[in-house]
Amino acid sequence: MGCASAKHVATVQNEEEAQRGKSYQNGDVFGDEYRIKPVEEVKYMKNGAEEEQKIAARNQENLEKSASSNTRLKTNKEIPGLVHQPRANMHISESQQEFFRMLDEKIEKGRDYCSEEEDIT
């Protein structure tokens, strides 16, 4: 019951502000860092549609390759339950797409020479 009165927005004025006609509300003391800022445009947002088309094409190719290899495995071995069926209508979130995009870039670049195997101390 006491919480409802605490939720009211209070205005505070000192003598100088009262003379100038300026009143502050709660939250005015915070600087610009807390105000809403526009979203910065980053690389993957600029080429989003183009990149998504490339990724979708690559994913489709991989699904087709996977489907053909899965059917070959199934006909050769005839072991049910060990071969996963491809999902044609799989939903992939943006974060997953970004992860796989970064993974593809890392694979294309080659081996990372600052790996855990080497002691760099």
Swiss-Prot record:
The keyword Phosphoprotein applies. Pfam families: DUF4612. InterPro entries: DUF4612. Residues 1-28, 60-81 are annotated as: Disordered. The modification Phosphoserine is found at residues 95, 115. Keywords: Phosphoprotein. PANTHER family: SIMILAR TO RIKEN CDNA 1700025G04 GENE. This is Uncharacterized protein C1orf21 homolog.
